[in-house]
Amino acid sequence: MKNKLPPFIEIYRALIATPSISATEEALDQSNADLITLLADWFKDLGFNVEVQPVPGTRNKFNMLASIGQGAGGLLLAGHTDTVPFDDGRWTRDPFTLTEHDGKLYGLGTADMKGFFAFILDTLRDVDVTKLKKPLYILATADEETSMAGARYFAETTALRPDCAIIGEPTSLQPVRAHKGHISNAIRIQGQSGHSSDPARGVNAIELMHDAIGHILQLRDNLKERYHYEAFTVPYPTLNLGHIHGGDASNRICACCELHMDIRPLPSMTLNELNGLLNDALAPVSERWPGRLTVDELHPPIPGYECPPNHQLVEVVEKLLGAKTEVVNYCTEAPFIQTLCPTLVLGPGSINQAHQPDEYLETRFIKPTRELIIQVIHHFCWH
């Protein structure tokens, strides 16, 4: 029953107080089971049917899908339950205690993005869900901050095909219809060690990597010249060399060298296309030194994402907000949800607060966010 639902600020407080950190380092990684249980119970109190699914390949992580209403289509409101780790020495407040000060709500996940679920739950108090003409779905995912395993698994396994979806990432309530993707790779060169006094008796992995880097930088120039999307502040794919390590002593021929790099592709580019371009760029090194160069993924790749600017969802949301959609350089779960239905990224709070010490959401977002959620439910579920 709706009267069992706690007040807005208490919902928010409980979500922030329930740790759900995602991290690649096992010691820091946490299950989101307790948070999913909180959300599931509250949506059940509102009359929703709730399904909780374990996400394969994770450390006890779960997705939750709450649904109400009958028929095809409808609206999906989606978000992730996890947060990044925090640096205790840089926070001046308890990350797991919601505190309000000077028009700001502080806490880990206030903006990115536990708060979105508090807004949805609180708004639904004022919605007569028994009168919906189309279904309303609420999706809470796992591990967005690391592998995006929750969104990937949901998109691969669900039969749902809503009319549209909104992902409530912090966009300062400015609708986002496109973003770049992200690919990160480790380039490894296996040489042959030996004493530096006789270089011919070894294969110097650093020298081979020097050759490989030249070809990678040529690929970077080719990407910049060949691909453009003027709406982005950086209107071409970027390629960054982020980390390199090789060798162990000045008097030893380097036996191994490893380079970490990333590419941020435009929405029009496929992951297979990018992998092909990278392999082609490195082919001269591989052919000259067979078996000594390998390319491995550091993280599961994320494709670029775009909702067409003339799509009905874009037009409706732009009209409701009185604001044009934007494109951004950071990544979200949108590429995976977009495989099910047209998707926008739109939510309260600023992306500038995400992953920051003393993360906060400004209270000025409370009223317009509630109004927006009511408006999109009315438009997509009652018409």
From Swiss-Prot:
Cofactor list: Zn(2+); Co(2+); glutathione
Pathway stated in the Swiss-Prot or TrEMBL entry: Amino-acid biosynthesis; L-arginine biosynthesis; L-ornithine from N(2)-acetyl-L-ornithine (linear): step 1/1
SUPFAM superfamilies: Bacterial exopeptidase dimerisation domain, Zn-dependent exopeptidases
Compartments in which it is found: Cytoplasm
Molecular function GO terms recorded: acetylornithine deacetylase activity; zinc ion binding
Record EC number: 3.5.1.16
Reactions this protein catalyses: N(2)-acetyl-L-ornithine + H2O = L-ornithine + acetate
InterPro entries the record matches: AcOrn-deacetyl, ArgE/DapE_CS, Bact_exopeptidase_dim_dom, Peptidase_M20, Peptidase_M20_dimer, Peptidase_M20A
Co-factor binding details: Binds 2 Zn(2+) or Co(2+) ions per subunit.
Annotated active site: 82, 144
Pfam families: M20_dimer, Peptidase_M20
Transmembrane spans: none
Binding site for Zn(2+) 2: 112, 145, 355
Family to which this protein belongs: Belongs to the peptidase M20A family. ArgE subfamily.
NCBIfam families per the UniProt record, alphabetical: AcOrn-deacetyl (TIGR01892), PRK05111.1 (NF003474)
Function: Catalyzes the hydrolysis of the amide bond of N(2)-acetylated L-amino acids. Cleaves the acetyl group from N-acetyl-L-ornithine to form L-ornithine, an intermediate in L-arginine biosynthesis pathway, and a branchpoint in the synthesis of polyamines.
Protein name per UniProt: Acetylornithine deacetylase
UniProt source species: Shigella sonnei (strain Ss046)
Gene encoding the protein: argE
